[in-house]
Amino acid sequence: MSNIVFLDVDGTLIELPASAAKAVDQARAHGHKVYICTGCSKAEILQRNLCDLDGMIGGNGAYVEDNNHVVMHQCLSKEDVKNIVDWCNERHIGFYLEANSGMYCNDYMLEQGPETMVKYAKGKGASLENAKSSAQHFIDGFIHLQGDELYRDDVNKISFILRTYQDHLDSKVDFPHLVANTWGGKGEVALFGDLGPTGITKRHAIEVLLDYLHADAKDTISFGDAKIDLSMFECCAYNVAMGNGGFEIKEAADYITDDVNEDGLYNAFKYLKLI
């Protein structure tokens, strides 16, 4: 029996170990389909040295692609983007617009981003040296825009640095019609907030993809490491939490594997007889 596997097992900055790429390659060779299911948008994914996949779900479910074919794409309205950009700038908050065409940031992101990204990478298990290198690589990937240039109509979601958790709570109050989440480092410490279109979740995106593939949810397996991945767990038949994941995702999992940097993905693929 072939399975459809959805992966969101690591952070934005942390490269998957060689064993993970090996596991994905072997699973696909055995007839299984493997998709990345991530908060990142396509431009961010393309910057990374990932193995071959059958497709991707990006922007926490805003974008669905199968073998280079766009199955679904739902962006924020230009009006919402303008309002969020102005909201962040008024608060002197660093942010970046996540689009398939690129990652577009404001002045404050260039100032505040490196320190926050180092915290993020260290929380995901990177050494200080690697965290600094990864953070700089990530910042270098931004396209710096100013003023009206940031009012775009191709944005999947917007991530912004949290000065305190209150920034996230304020975003929920000020943008009640949008989906507000947080993401961060070890133990899901909230370093960033994000805002995306309403109705968009990883679960919804998986259901759209399964319908497109004429596939059955009983053949699905998901891998997650954070609270945002709980919606994947709601619709997939079997769910795996990474050892470096947060408490809530582990509580909801059918199986907990090792940390991603300790061959957790490869070990779980073997356990599930995908390879």
Description of each model-found segment:
Residues S2-I4, F192-I275:
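Mg2+-dependent phosphoryl-transfer enzymes with acidic/Ser/Thr/Gly-rich catalytic loops
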Residues S2-L16, I84, F233:
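Asp-based phosphoryl-transfer active-site loop
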Residues G11, G61, G224-A226:
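Active-site metal-binding loops of divalent metal-dependent hydrolases
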Residues L16-G123:
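Active-site phosphate-binding/coordination module
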Residues C51-D52, N60, D174-H177, C235-C236, ...:
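Short, structured coil segments at secondary-structure junctions
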Residues D54-G61, A180-W183, N239-G243, T257-D258:
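Short hydrophobic/aromatic-enriched beta-strand-loop microsegments
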Residues G102-I221:
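Conserved acidic, metal-coordinating active-site core of Asp-based
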